[in-house]
Amino acid sequence: MHKKRVEEGEASDFSLAWDSSVTAAGGLEGEPECDQKTSRALEDRNSVTSQEERNEDDEDMEDESIYTCDHCQQDFESLADLTDHRAHRCPGDGDDDPQLSWVASSPSSKDVASPTQMIGDGCDLGLGEEEGGTGLPYPCQFCDKSFIRLSYLKRHEQIHSDKLPFKCTYCSRLFKHKRSRDRHIKLHTGDKKYHCHECEAAFSRSDHLKIHLKTHSSSKPFKCTVCKRGFSSTSSLQSHMQAHKKNKEHLAKSEKEAKKDDFMCDYCEDTFSQTEELEKHVLTRHPQLSEKADLQCIHCPEVFVDENTLLAHIHQAHANQKHKCPMCPEQFSSVEGVYCHLDSHRQPDSSNHSVSPDPVLGSVASMSSATPDSSASVERGSTPDSTLKPLRGQKKMRDDGQGWTKVVYSCPYCSKRDFNSLAVLEIHLKTIHADKPQQSHTCQICLDSMPTLYNLNEHVRKLHKNHAYPVMQFGNISAFHCNYCPEMFADINSLQEHIRVSHCGPNANPSDGNNAFFCNQCSMGFLTESSLTEHIQQAHCSVGSAKLESPVVQPTQSFMEVYSCPYCTNSPIFGSILKLTKHIKENHKNIPLAHSKKSKAEQSPVSSDVEVSSPKRQRLSASANSISNGEYPCNQCDLKFSNFESFQTHLKLHLELLLRKQACPQCKEDFDSQESLLQHLTVHYMTTSTHYVCESCDKQFSSVDDLQKHLLDMHTFVLYHCTLCQEVFDSKVSIQVHLAVKHSNEKKMYRCTACNWDFRKEADLQVHVKHSHLGNPAKAHKCIFCGETFSTEVELQCHITTHSKKYNCKFCSKAFHAIILLEKHLREKHCVFDAATENGTANGVPPMATKKAEPADLQGMLLKNPEAPNSHEASEDDVDASEPMYGCDICGAAYTMEVLLQNHRLRDHNIRPGEDDGSRKKAEFIKGSHKCNVCSRTFFSENGLREHLQTHRGPAKHYMCPICGERFPSLLTLTEHKVTHSKSLDTGTCRICKMPLQSEEEFIEHCQMHPDLRNSLTGFRCVVCMQTVTSTLELKIHGTFHMQKLAGSSAASSPNGQGLQKLYKCALCLKEFRSKQDLVKLDVNGLPYGLCAGCMARSANGQVGGLAPPEPADRPCAGLRCPECSVKFESAEDLESHMQVDHRDLTPETSGPRKGTQTSPVPRKKTYQCIKCQMTFENEREIQIHVANHMIEEGINHECKLCNQMFDSPAKLLCHLIEHSFEGMGGTFKCPVCFTVFVQANKLQQHIFAVHGQEDKIYDCSQCPQKFFFQTELQNHTMSQHAQ
């Protein structure tokens, strides 16, 4: 068996092949109308199927397929765009595209399952472009490749099987979504529920049907007779018809070129130039495919050419196996005995009973074994030899029917067709196709099932040997012929489909004049008389005779009657009335059988109520006795006719009655077509219900909620993801074990219960206890605010005064820790700017001088100047002095009701009403460790501290000063602040013309005399400080400010300015004294305090000089600090020189009242302070030498004790400690003194060095006199300096 190489793809349809031959011979004009309908129906169906395969979508419903033009390779997102492009703008072809049998037949770029499939289909795309590259417009979402076309990208994505979890069970194509896979499977299952009402086309999607309906639009009245496509003009139709002609010429050319191709092996696809080489190759490499290799091993699928090779193979490969007959239970001692016994299964025995296949079995054996379905019958997938052979030169069969020709069997699973006996076929099935499911073989006469073909042969030979049921010999007739046209088909399924499509439509009538030519010998129908004459010459004339036989010659062959079910949509064909009856009883219960016989009166052809079966029959038959008597019986009504013409006329009446009306068996309603009847009949039997099916276990649920609950309970896995190492675990226990093993770094912290300090090492805690608690056992007095201990009650009372707010506002009774906070409060809340004489912080005076200046009586200042513009303003936070206030003795918070105070004490200090002071102190000790830098309140959590800090920030400040960068909540406060940057002298003199100004009116009028041309807003500027003003209000504020300064300076120089005198308070009894001489100066932890004589007498107990705690031996320099500013000095001479220069007014000889003529204090010399030890130096060289000594002794590495990070300078360490202080604060850094906000820690550090001095530091070290701005500085200092 030799086969030439052919193109891969689907085999051409028989009807299309016959149509092509007729068209080539007679042209399109001679094509009959019914055959045109047949060809169009098949072409439409094929085009629809291919289109649905191409247009399958693998994305969301909104993301439809990408459609590519065949000519210009341009991609489109929808079929409508592609249709418009090909109809109007495509340069390659417009209306004459032969592939556009309907609009949506353009291939989709998503239709490619693999590159090899595309190449096999004849794709001529460049391999270099398909491989992809980089920088191309369509990148892959799973890898780094990109492609020049979207179709290449979709083809490439199929290799990412791990990203496409859903797979088609038919073609192994991969999909990203399940819904895309389900839509694709419809292409394989043929689920097409959208039907065209104009033609027989069906679609699985509604959008495809809508596009197809455009071809039937009335706007395109000119229809193509081949593909039924509509056109708007005759010229377009003629151009389209030329495309059909070119397509047929191309097919003819391709067939001619295919004959010149090399010969290809069917098994390994090797090609050979000569048939002899192909035969030699098949014999040596694939003996199972060769016709000469007919010796098969009884144990395995191997096939051999000669007996010696077969016997050698059995002795080598199957020497230990028993030699058993595959057809029966007998066993033999040698291989030769097995093969001799196998001959008895196919040779006649001594009793002359033929053991060869029975004629009945020969007609149906291969058909019944053709399908792997155990319940399949002859009408489903029979496999006689499908190769169409011409029916020429066939000899007539003998009338006695005894000369049966040899039956050839074919395998239903492979291309092997030539099996001389059932035994050989059975061996082939059991060895080569052992993996196939076991199937039963049905007897065509009694419908009994047999396990093997051999058993079926024996059954037919014994039970149905004399059965008179006529059968057709497939060994002699190689094809099935249609009764209504010259079409031939290889199997019954193709014949049944052809009859249903071509001859059972609403317009198809096989009884018209063109189909009235039937052969008298075999009852085959033909279109023309010439075709009938040619058929008789070829099929029913002897080889040597050229004359036509008489049309009345009786047929000598037996034919098989074919019955079709009238209730099924696909009209299956059955070989016997028994099988049809069984089919109706199983599938159409309670429906009367259409083939039930009636009385002869009811069977009259004249009656219009005759019920007949479907006209789809493969052969017209008659019994042998009737034919021999010259009668033609009708198998529909049992009438007999003497000649063939009468019989043919009678049969046409049956067909006309059947096609005229079809009645519903339930309600007797008539319908024009079987499809309409089926749709109507379905309504009688149909009940609809909605169920939701689980894809995994196929369980059904009545609601979506039940399905989701089932999926969550049965098919959902909860995974636990470790955010530290990104590992995933399937149970809670697993991740707990993982966290305990890998991420549980146990680290002990040692806390001092007395002062709540934490230490990383036990040795550090021991050092802390040694220096802080063990060395001072007599310090029993502890501060309830900071936990510091003192030896006596006097020292504790002196220390408590440091927690009070020293600077009080005279307007609203508010108190502040630092003078700068009081000044800021006065400017923002009370709009008081004259701070030179009243608050001791005049512009231009160094910060150290503010401490020496006496606080002013602001109320007296307002009495002197009642016209001050801001004296009437009151703050929202002002407290009415007339209401009774209840203050908290722990944090100083004041409330108007006692209940509010009790709630505050319970919420913030955990002190319940009625508890004594001991419980309060105990609760204070266990108070939280998060301390507010503004009001010193503590909190248990960082979140509580963060919420508390929001109360200090006040309203949003959107107006920033262009000079210092400070922000203000309103434009008015910003304007008042900008005035404070004035650097003019106290003389209200114009800096342009030197004219003195005495009042605000003079100032405003004089400013108009010197306009500022650069100021586009107002055109003016302040003539005293030369600042640009943005509004008239700002100019008035400048005038008020400068005139107040002038009045204040004159008041300070007048004798009346000496009336204000500072009062000094005792630190213990808080009594006020007019002179410092009335108080005794004490030094407690490096800070100066004053006690009156009475307190000293009551508390000293004879130890006046022992009030100050003794200095430890390891602090020799603790006493060399300035008692006023706490600056450390290395020698007593330096301290004395510092006191003479910087604190001359406080020395005994100058401690009296200051002279009235002195208007400004002595300016302080510029000093340099070490960041590490806070020592002060007079020049830069000395501090450089000091820093060098630090580097020599301690090295250049400075460690942060909080996180063990190293830095190469103390400044960087200080900046790092500032970052520690503001961790979790949103990336903002706020000055603890003036509350200016910065976004960088180094900016805050620069701000502290430039603006604030030693007196503004908040946190004091309990073991040395050093002070710090931040608590983290104090912690790092304690752990590094006092832990040893």
From Swiss-Prot:
A molecular-function term among this protein's GO annotations: RNA polymerase II cis-regulatory region sequence-specific DNA binding
Keywords for the protein's UniProt record, in alphabetical order: Activator, Ciliopathy, Developmental protein, Differentiation, Disease variant, DNA-binding, Joubert syndrome, Metal-binding, Nephronophthisis, Neurogenesis, Nucleus, Phosphoprotein, Repeat, Repressor, Transcription, Transcription regulation, Zinc, Zinc-finger
Keyword Zinc-finger appears in the UniProt entry: yes
Expression (tissue specificity): Expressed in brain, lung, skeletal muscle, heart, pancreas and kidney but not liver or placenta. Also expressed in aorta, ovary, pituitary, small intestine, fetal brain, fetal kidney and, within the adult brain, in the substantia nigra, medulla, amygdala, thalamus and cerebellum.
A Pfam family hit: zf-C2H2
GO terms for biological process, alphabetical: cell differentiation; negative regulation of cold-induced thermogenesis; negative regulation of DNA-templated transcription; nervous system development; Notch signaling pathway; positive regulation of BMP signaling pathway; positive regulation of DNA-templated transcription; protein localization to cilium
Outcome of substituting residue 426 to A: Abolishes the ability to bind promoter of BMP target genes
Listed Polar residues bias regions: 102-117
Segments of skewed composition (Basic and acidic residues): 34-46, 1136-1147
Stretches for region Disordered: 1-64, 87-117, 346-398, 590-624, 1136-1163
C2H2-type zinc-finger residues: 67-93, 138-160, 166-188, 194-216, 222-244, 263-286, 295-318, 323-345, 409-433, 441-464, 480-503, 517-540, 563-588, 632-654, 662-684, 692-715, 720-743, 750-773, 781-803, 807-830, 886-908, 930-952, 959-981, 1020-1042, 1064-1082, 1120-1143, 1168-1190, 1198-1220, 1229-1252, 1259-1282
Effect of residue 581 to A: Abolishes the ability to bind promoter of BMP target genes
Cellular location(s): Nucleus
Start-end of Low complexity biased regions: 363-377, 604-615
Bridged cysteine pairs (disulfide): none
Compositional bias of kind Acidic residues: 54-64
Modified residues (Phosphoserine): 47, 50, 604, 1054
Predominant location category: nucleus
GO CC, one annotated term: nucleus
Family statement: Belongs to the krueppel C2H2-type zinc-finger protein family.
Subunit details: Homodimer. Interacts with EBF1. Interacts with SMAD1 and SMAD4. Interacts with PARP1. Interacts with CEP290.
Domain notes from UniProt: Uses different DNA- and protein-binding zinc fingers to regulate the distinct BMP-Smad and Olf signaling pathways. C2H2-type zinc fingers 14-19 mediate the interaction with SMAD1 and SMAD4, while zinc fingers 28-30 mediate the interaction with EBF1. zinc fingers 2-8 bind the 5'-CCGCCC-3' DNA sequence in concert with EBF1, while zinc fingers 9-13 bind BMP target gene promoters in concert with SMADs.
Disease with which this protein is associated in UniProt: Nephronophthisis 14: An autosomal recessive disorder manifesting as infantile-onset kidney disease, cerebellar vermis hypoplasia, and situs inversus. Nephronophthisis is a progressive tubulo-interstitial kidney disorder histologically characterized by modifications of the tubules with thickening of the basement membrane, interstitial fibrosis and, in the advanced stages, medullary cysts.
Record's function text: Transcription factor that can both act as an activator or a repressor depending on the context. Plays a central role in BMP signaling and olfactory neurogenesis. Associates with SMADs in response to BMP2 leading to activate transcription of BMP target genes. Acts as a transcriptional repressor via its interaction with EBF1, a transcription factor involved in terminal olfactory receptor neurons differentiation; this interaction preventing EBF1 to bind DNA and activate olfactory-specific genes.
Name of this protein: Zinc finger protein 423
Organism this protein belongs to: Homo sapiens (Human)
Gene assigned in the entry: ZNF423
